């Protein structure tokens, strides 16, 4: 037999992306695009009649999304449309029937009953749903419709009375309604994150419902959802969420798909790329670029030598007094060896104290760059012997005069200078040496009596006083680290140290006193000063 004619949809309408317009907006509702329509190649919903060749009348109406398919209160508007539906006749020359000027116009809720009554009066009920069900307004979904295509063939009288079975299209959703609108990701603030997840993403989108939306991450069979609450959906157009962790640890970045999904109808948006980055503190490798290999460091050290590891020592900070002035450090004037002006140099303590010659002594350790010398004037005044007369008795008269330097030329401003020799101080542990300082308790030199000082020859006194006057200021400013020089008594040498009166001191010495007799008298008055028995008794 011959097959019965039937309707086939050649191109379905686009389900999303079209907004339903109200009549009060005063503008065209637009045209329903075909599902394959593009900006450069626009298409529209199309049908064709198979197993038939001839004239046909086509009626297109709107019905509900779900069964039973009832006539929808929204209207179709455009060319060849009246009372909310489309109807037109086509000749046999057109195989494919396209509907280019169909638009959807929505009605207000208060006009729903009126619109349904109009459908009943016009006999617009393709699936013959009972009338009592048509008045149940709460069952209508105003955000989605379907196109219903009906074809009527002419009878023997030429009237279009032979109806073919109706055919419905895919649902068409109102893009202005959040619960049915097309899902679209407009923009994200970042498209990469850690493989461990937890990165905060700001996503801008078209209108969504806060209780009917989710962010999905997909790669093959793996799927995960972003974490957010309804409070994180801002005015239906922005979502703030945190990324989920990836399926596994990775060593290189991996790209997945991120998209919106509506659970109510399982609608999804076009996906965008999202990159998961390896779990590294420095995901871009900047740290590795800055690092040097062990071999490179070793080569650098070999090339530069030990100077690489040595740091220059900081220069010592100069001493500053509370007033902010630098204090000049005077050199230590004490000589490592004992020297008396006019008495020569005593190389060691054994020449002064024969009893101490058998005891071991340890010379003081001095720095390589510091030779502390004692000015001759100071050396004359300071002596570790019990008295000056005891030292004089140990030396002959010739030894006193042999090393006395001659005074400078008359009128010369220079003073007599004595050669400073190193001073060999006795050891701190030399008990025999310190026993000779009973009167000072080992803290300083013994005081010399005035009589002993007067017994010195006039030439020695003249030379000594000149030395005292030249270095009076430096004596008081001297700095020493020796504990034996911390206690000095200058009471008996006031006249000697007075620079302004040193010429008067010269006149106090009797000019008629022969130098030799003075020495003999001084030495004869102390017969036991150089006796070894005196020192050995200690």
Curated annotation (Swiss-Prot):
GO terms for cellular component: cytoplasm; nucleus. Transmembrane segments: none annotated. Keywords: DNA-binding, Nucleus, Phosphoprotein, Proto-oncogene. It is found in: Nucleus. It holds the Pfam family RHD_dimer. A motif (Nuclear localization signal) lies at residues 287-292. The modification Phosphoserine is found at residue 264. GO terms for biological process: canonical NF-kappaB signal transduction; cellular response to stress; inflammatory response; innate immune response; non-canonical NF-kappaB signal transduction; positive regulation of transcription by RNA polymerase II; response to cytokine. The keyword DNA-binding applies. Homodimer; component of the NF-kappa-B c-Rel-c-Rel complex. Component of the NF-KAPPA-B p65-c-Rel complex. Proto-oncogene that may play a role in differentiation and lymphopoiesis. NF-kappa-B is a pleiotropic transcription factor which is present in almost all cell types and is involved in many biological processed such as inflammation, immunity, differentiation, cell growth, tumorigenesis and apoptosis. NF-kappa-B is a homo- or heterodimeric complex formed by the Rel-like domain-containing proteins RELA/p65, RELB, NFKB1/p105, NFKB1/p50, REL and NFKB2/p52. This is Proto-oncogene c-Rel. It comes from Meleagris gallopavo. The lineage of its organism: Eukaryota, Metazoa, Chordata, Craniata, Vertebrata.
